[in-house]
Amino acid sequence: MPLQTFLFEIGTEELPADFVRSAITQWQGLIPPGLAAEFLQPESVEIYGTPRRLAVLIKGLPECQPDRLEEIKGPPASAAFKDGQPTPAALGFAKKQGVNPEDFEIRSTPKGDFIFVNKQLQGQASRDLLPKLALSWLKALDGRRFMRWGDGDWRFPRPIRWLVCLLDDQVLPLQIDNGSTTLVGDRLSRGHRILHPADVSLEHGQNYLAQLKTAGVVVDPQERRAMIEQQITTQAATLEGEAIIYEDLLDEVEQLVEYPTAVLGKFDQEFLSLPREVTTTVMVTHQRYFPVVDKDGRLLPHFITIANGDPSKGDIIAAGNGRVIRARLADAKFFYQADCDDSLDSYLPQLETVTFQEELGTMRDKVDRIMEMAAAIADQLGVTEQQRGEIDSTAMLCKADLVTQMVYEFPELQGIMGEKYALVSGESAAVAQGIVEHYLPRHQDDDLPQGLPGQVVGMADRLDTLVSIFGLGLLPTGSSDPFALRRAANAVINVAWAASLEINLLELLTQGCRDFVTSHPDKTSPLQALKTFFLQRLQTLLQDEQGIDYDLVNAVLGNGETNCDEAQSRLHDRLLADLQDVKERAQYLQELRDNGHLDAIYPTVNRSAKLASKGTLPTDQLDPRPVIQAPQLVQDSEKAVYQALLAIYPKAVEVQESRDYETLVNALHELAPTVAEFFDGPDSVLVMAENDELRQNRLNLLGLIRNYALILGDFGAIVKGI
């Protein structure tokens, strides 16, 4: 069977760069399975996009679907036949499927006997299927800022201007009706708006990329990206320098041009006196230029921009872009000098004019709360007097730059300018660093704060936000988190883990919620909701970022079958009171599984815990003496277990303080043979004895084993064999 090539292109006005990237990704996930659902298996599916077009090029496509046998389920057999004759329901089903009742097969299913028919279906021609599929692919695209175009109801990010629908060299019928506008699929595409403004008559789908390149359009985003990188590198080399290629910027400009041309421009040397972050922000964020540095990494008074115009007009483009950036940098220099005329702390009163959030006061109010929370964290950490002073100053000044002229004009410089202005104002390097670092991490892969002031103040800032927003009842949902509360909670945990900060999160949340209710007497405490939220974040971070098996995470978090509600509540408080311990126990359990040592203690603990759940021993009871009646120990095997537990008890108490879980695991490992004799040896005992005192005594023995293991984790959550 000959193989065909199908081309579908949508031509538009200039699309937003982020939509082009998103549309390509959407089609990559949509079109191949969509073809497979129609029993079409091409050799390749290539998705392309530029600012003015989206296209799919399908190669090696069969002329038609394969013939196939389709099994169709009908009504229940009990409703299909009566006295051996087909009922109206059966006859209706047969008519609908174009078969005779004699063709029915009765088959058993989990829901009873049903009638089935097998139909031989002839494959449809690809040319008949593709126009409908193409239209469905277009309608399936989703994104922000869709608009109506023309006078119809069609919505798309920009008006659609042309359609190409080619199967090999033949145009397939495809039509979009949008009010008074009708677009019909054709072979006519369009070239580059400047380099080749005329139509391009496409001869064959296989010639698509080559013909458009001749017309000044590089359709393949990856090819454009490679061209941009190569041209940028070449231009920077003319200065004996190197371009700083930001991946986010490269992602964007790749979708802003159809035929990229790198243009080298320059600005006045005087602007290099500005903080580097200011200059690069103006270039990268506001102008989409690539900065250039010398061999020592020093910024040069040059930039590289990617033009979508005539390469021969490079000098004109460079001059125009140079004028624009000089004006922007001149403004930035004015803002910087004006801001430096006053000390950073002089901006604090102006924070009273900035609202943090309705019902939560001003940014100055938030700073006061951050200072209180930071002081509480500092108390927990037992910092030195010097460190406390640095933390206090960082907390007080961390938001002061928000009301400076520079940050008002360039909001992305918040924190960065706070650091610069702090140094100009005579603050210590530690305080300046803390101001910029308290925003870290800004996103999942961002750096973490390295200095103690930034770590403490960053956690305090996020905890205040979490308590305040939760207090207003604005909790994140599965699809919406407008205040980035998940990211804030993740940052608190990750900063504490990375810096080994021994904070008591439960205590901090309790204090924060208490203060919130005091200042908002009409609100209820969000403490329980916050505890649940942080436990969810712990589970996600341990599994997704630390790579801990899900069942071991559940064991550490106390989500096992052997844990009662009372024990879970107490354990959850323990988790939030010691974040470092949570991570250490999870990692240790994973290590035990990986080296095979977990299997040595799992049977003993798991069997004991399951039986212990039938008893009444509290999960925090560790001392055997008050709960085991020695005179009631009848058989040698249970006496041996009791003696072993007496030996483990002091170790268990010590492990709770030392977190030396290896000692506990070794003790449980040594206990295993004794417990095996208790259960299955010649002198085994019947745990669920008829005598109440004997039964309770034996259940308490097993409960103590469970309780010792709970110091490490709830073994009832562990899945054997993973």
Curated annotation (Swiss-Prot):
<keyword id="KW-0547">Nucleotide-binding</keyword>
<dbReference type="GO" id="GO:0006420">
    <property type="term" value="P:arginyl-tRNA aminoacylation"/>
</dbReference>
<dbReference type="InterPro" id="IPR015944">
    <property type="entry name" value="Gly-tRNA-synth_bsu"/>
</dbReference>
<dbReference type="GO" id="GO:0006426">
    <property type="term" value="P:glycyl-tRNA aminoacylation"/>
</dbReference>
<keyword id="KW-0436">Ligase</keyword>
<comment type="similarity">
    <text>Belongs to the class-II aminoacyl-tRNA synthetase family.</text>
</comment>
<dbReference type="Pfam" id="PF05746">
    <property type="entry name" value="DALR_1"/>
</dbReference>
<keyword id="KW-0963">Cytoplasm</keyword>
<dbReference type="GO" id="GO:0005524">
    <property type="term" value="F:ATP binding"/>
</dbReference>
<dbReference type="InterPro" id="IPR008909">
    <property type="entry name" value="DALR_anticod-bd"/>
</dbReference>
<dbReference type="Pfam" id="PF02092">
    <property type="entry name" value="tRNA_synt_2f"/>
</dbReference>
<dbReference type="InterPro" id="IPR006194">
    <property type="entry name" value="Gly-tRNA-synth_heterodimer"/>
</dbReference>
<protein>
    <recommendedName>
        <fullName>Glycine--tRNA ligase beta subunit</fullName>
        <ecNumber>6.1.1.14</ecNumber>
    </recommendedName>
</protein>
<dbReference type="GO" id="GO:0004820">
    <property type="term" value="F:glycine-tRNA ligase activity"/>
</dbReference>
<comment type="subunit">
    <text>Tetramer of two alpha and two beta subunits.</text>
</comment>
<keyword id="KW-0648">Protein biosynthesis</keyword>
<dbReference type="GO" id="GO:0004814">
    <property type="term" value="F:arginine-tRNA ligase activity"/>
</dbReference>
<keyword id="KW-0067">ATP-binding</keyword>
<keyword id="KW-0030">Aminoacyl-tRNA synthetase</keyword>
<dbReference type="GO" id="GO:0005829">
    <property type="term" value="C:cytosol"/>
</dbReference>
